[in-house]
Amino acid sequence: MATGTREEIRIGQLAIRFLVEGKDSGGSVAIFEFDVPAGAKVPIAHSHDAYEETIYGIDGVLTFTLEGRTIEVGPGDALCIPRGAVHRFDNLHSATSRTLAIVSPGILGPDYFREIAAVAKAAAGGPPDPVAIGEVMRRHGLTPAP
């Protein structure tokens, strides 16, 4: 099986690297690693109906909100996010976190993050256009939470 491009996609200070893309796994899974700097609050609360997402902590701690519950994911911790569950995460701690995300089936790919990065870059350091962010999210199967 071929592996992902390992291209680093940057959205502000957030860095994403795909290790396995859906096209590499026959569509069964996509795996990406992401680094979130201390103090970062990302992304917009959202859900996805077409795939499950499992998060595995490597370094640092991310604080997830999943269906209204607060869950900290640190090194060695795993969090399963079922289809349709509203979630988001922040790095409320003093160190950068590194986390692995496993998406099954592997329908979320680097194109989504590239498009989000382009919207963020167009904001020139200001807040990204929420309408444009929502359009990109919906195009890639994510539903922004109200």
Residue ranges of model-derived segments:
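Structural motif
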Residues: 15, 54, 61-63, 70, ...
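Short, conserved beta-strand element in jelly-roll/cupin
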Residues: 33-37, 47-65, 102-104
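Acidic/histidine-enriched, glycine/proline-rich intrinsically disordered or flexible terminal extensions
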Residues: 114-146
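Short beta-strand segments
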Residues: 43-45, 66-71
